Amino acid sequence: VKANGWIEGLTITSIILGVVLGGQLVDARLWTDVLALGLPGVNKPVHGALALLILIYGVAAVFNMRIPRTTAVLRPMPSHQGALLADFWRCNGRLWRDRLGQISLATTTLFWGVSGNMRYIVLAWAAAALHYSTTQAASLVGVVALGTAVGAVVASMRVRLDRATQVMPLGILMGALLVAMVYVDHLWVAVPFLVFMGALGGYIVVPMNALLQHRGHNLMGAGRSIAVQNFNEQACILALGFLYSASTGLGLSAFAAIALFGAVVVVSMALIQLWYRHNLRHHTAEIKQLMRIARGKNAPP
């Protein structure tokens, strides 16, 4: 859980920086001064923005090339693309059939689905409720991400792996806060509100992500598990993004679409909790054994 706290915290920090930077890059006032410098190849604002993004990606590539190899034994991978795809789907099904893996995968998938669309929701809400421009609203997206980072760090210090499922009820509260967001129309309320909502998300995702990777590592290895996790998370981002876009496309206001989005989160988290309780009732021995494995490998000194 502590390792996941660091990983998620740094990931969310990068999101904060990306959102704030993106908000500044679309500000026409910035490029008025930059274009006046007469830099070669930078004749339009889009040229400068793309050049900066390419530079950032280049720096990231250099960092990735310097990551040291570990001594962990790698599991063999099929060389043929067809066999590789079949192996992926087997791993996907295996993780969804695991009594703890399915719960943690469902929770983290939903969280990242919400997180991936949160920036668009906050932009739309800030424009409708606070009459903010895109640049101004981008700072509020950063506020949500800041809260998520804080929640991730707190969870890494307070939640043990074998108690990860205890944070799931907070998911319903997070969805309810999304619904309540439509009633917030003052900045002094919005900032702590968004920080708290982000912190809830961070507090949920770190222990559940740690539990998911623990089960994935035991079932199929870390690499395959991460591939399955990312596939499901990206699919959820697309699905929830389509839901939000379809809602606004059908004529719903930004407030109504956000409320619908939050209601979907509440219902989804309630169903995941019912699913977990069903597993506890009907697969008690298996759940207890899996929790013993988690406790044994992550027991405090």
Model-based region annotation:
Residues 1-27, 103, 111-120, 144, ...:
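Substrate-agnostic recognition of the 12-TM MFS/MFS-like secondary transporter fold
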Residues 5, 134-142, 227, 258:
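Small-residue hotspots at the loop-to-helix junctions and early N-terminal turns
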Residues 13, 20, 26, 31-50, ...:
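A single, central transmembrane helix in multi-pass transporters
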Residues 26, 150-164, 248-249:
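Helix-to-loop junctions at the C-terminal end of transmembrane segments
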Residues 45-46, 50-80, 161, 273-286:
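Helix-loop junctions on the cytosolic side of multi-pass membrane transporters
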Residues 58, 109, 146, 179-180, ...:
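Hydrophobic residues within the alpha-helical transmembrane core of Major Facilitator Superfamily
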Residues 63-64, 180-181, 197, 272:
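MFS-fold secondary transporters
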Residues 172-186:
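C-terminal ends and interior cores of transmembrane alpha-helices
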